[in-house]
Design a protein with these regions (language model features):
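Short amphipathic alpha-helical coupling elements at transmembrane boundaries
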Residues: 37, 78-81, 102, 122, ...
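Catalytic core of membrane glycerolipid acyltransferases/transacylases, capturing the structured
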Residues: 11-29, 42-43, 56-117
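Generic preference for hydrophobic
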Residues: 49, 63, 88-89, 195-197
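Membrane-helix interface/capping segments
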Residues: 37, 47-54, 79
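A generic, lipid-embedded transmembrane alpha helix
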Residues: 33-45
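Non-catalytic C-terminal accessory region of glycerolipid acyltransferases
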Residues: 121-239
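Membrane-interfacial terminal anchoring regions of lipid-handling membrane enzymes
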Residues: 1-20, 26, 30, 53-56, ...
Length: 239
């Protein structure tokens, strides 16, 4: 936990004065992201990204990610260097975790109030417009909460509604299990994180009637890839 807090402080809080020159710009997070990756590498954790050829920066859309730990911030930082126009969607409560919430706001993070359905829908409708107008990609964790299970949690449907409303693409991105984190013994070991960017899934022509089928399709695809990547990453783990 100390490592996570220290890393978050160094990569988000220290650069806040720089973010003020152009607030809410996603690329504000680029330099902190590089620092985050270098910092965690000191602890023996390496990141490998596959499937960069599937990225089309001209396409706005929804990027689906599995959610495991607070150090997902490093994974998001690494993906920013590939996608460049990607912003995470997170629960509003994180905004009030000062000063991290302010830093997150300044790098363009989108906050939603999950307890207020109407408010959350309004925010996502606004972002759906940005997807089309600004070619923005929203990084969404469809499981809704982080966990360290071997089975992904049932996907919530909000991200799929956003993609269909904007008639944009969905791009699944799967992150291997963090075998190097021992939650029971609270130990942080050495290991490798494998991130796989899958081909885009178009939603053009889809309607609300297709949400359930699309959700199930993405859940099955991501679970299959998660199992395979996690098994491969396990051989690099040294706790």
């Amino acid at each position: 936990m100390f490592i996570i807090v220290l890393m978050s402080f160094l990569v988000l809080v220290v650069p806040i004065p720089l973010f003020l020159f152009k607030p809410r710009w996603p690329l504000n997070a680029l330099i902190p992201g590089i620092v985050a990756c270098a910092f965690i590498r000191l602890f023996g954790v390496e990141y490998e990204i596959r499937g960069q050829e599937h990225i089309n920066v001209r396409n706005g859309g929804v990027v689906l990610l599995n959610h495991q730990s607070a150090i997902d911030i490093v994974m998001l930082s690494r993906l920013l260097r590939e996608f460049r126009n990607i912003v995470p969607v997170v629960k509003k409560e994180l905004f009030y975790m000062l000063p991290f919430g302010i830093a997150s706001y300044l790098v363009g993070v989108v906050f939603i109030d999950r307890k207020n359905t109407a408010s959350a829908k309004d925010v996502m409708k606004r972002e759906a417009v940005a997807i089309t107008k600004d070619h923005l990609k929203l990084a969404i964790f469809p499981e809704g909460t982080r966990h360290d299970n071997d089975t992904l949690l049932p996907f919530k449907k909000g991200s799929f509604h956003v993609a269909i409303d904007s008639q944009s693409i969905i791009q699944p991105v799967i992150v291997s299990k963090y075998h190097f984190i021992d939650h029971k013994r609270k130990r942080f070991g050495r290991g490798r994180v494998i991130i796989k960017i899958m081909p885009e899934i178009p939603t053009k022509g889809m309607t609300k009637a297709d949400v359930n089928e699309l959700t199930d399709r993405c859940q099955q695809l991501m679970q299959t890839e998660f199992d395979a990547l996690s098994a491969e990453a396990k051989q690099y783990c040294h706790n």
